[in-house]
Regions:
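Residues that define the transmembrane beta-barrel architecture of outer-membrane proteins
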Residues: 1, 25-29, 74-80, 114-122, ...
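Short glycine/proline- and aromatic-enriched beta-strand/turn motifs that initiate or cap beta-hairpins
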Residues: 1-22
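Residues on the lipid-exposed face of transmembrane beta-strands in outer-membrane beta-barrel proteins
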Residues: 3-9, 31-35, 80-86, 95-97, ...
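Short loop/turn motifs that connect adjacent beta-strands in outer-membrane beta-barrel proteins
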Residues: 11, 38-45, 85-93, 126-136, ...
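Mid-chain, structured segments of secreted extracytoplasmic proteins
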Residues: 20-49
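Outer-membrane beta-barrel translocator/channel fold
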Residues: 46-81, 86, 96-108, 137-152, ...
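A contiguous pocket-lining binding segment that forms or flanks enzyme active sites
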Residues: 107-133
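Predominantly the C-terminal beta-signal and adjacent terminal strand-loop region
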Residues: 141, 150-177
């Protein structure tokens, strides 16, 4: 079950997204604030991503409730993102880069210190149409080693091709599939 609630005024938007399993206790709550700079400008976003069950501290004490924000113990991952669509009508490629800058995204460095990992994810999207079917090709990647995404270096982690087509029943009603 994944409800979404969004609100926008001008170029500013707030979005709340959640996910829960109907058969298990897995939960996620994401809150995002975003601002688009002009009609064709980049979009800057800041988000908190919270996963239930992600913050067991070293002494075994479970402290992961939604309102617990202590560094190194919180289940929140704070992330900044920058997205941009190339202003080329025949090549509308969008590029997005997201980096976790605070919260539970941690790693032990070479000196044995618990530090912020700065895990990042990059995604390219290219929309196009073929015979009335709208398509979107996606390539997502992790640019460097990070414990958050379980990779030891550069890795392509998401390849997708999405297809949608509206089936028109009459002039006022269509069903997107």
């Amino acid at each position: 079950f994944q409800p979404t609630l969004g609100f926008s005024v001008g170029n500013f938007s707030l979005t709340a997204w959640g996910s829960t399993s109907l058969s298990e206790s897995n939960k996620e709550i994401d809150l995002t604030a975003a601002y688009k700079f002009g009609e064709a400008g980049p979009t800057l976003s800041v988000a908190t991503l919270w996963w239930d069950g992600q913050a067991d501290v070293a002494n075994g004490e479970y402290t992961n409730n939604y309102f617990h924000f202590k560094s190194g113990e919180t289940g929140h991952h704070f992330e900044a993102g920058l997205a941009y669509t190339l202003p080329i009508e025949k090549f509308p490629l969008s590029i997005a880069w997201y980096t976790m800058f605070a919260g539970a995204d941690r790693k032990i460095n070479d000196k044995g210190e618990d530090k912020q990992a700065y895990s990042s994810y990059v995604e390219l999207n290219y929309p196009f149409s073929v015979k009335g079917v709208d398509l979107n090709a996606t390539c997502g990647m992790v640019p460097y080693e990070t414990p958050q995404y379980y990779v030891n270096g550069f890795a392509v982690t998401n390849l997708a091709l999405k297809a949608t087509k509206a089936i028109n029943f009459n002039d006022k009603f269509s069903l997107p599939i």
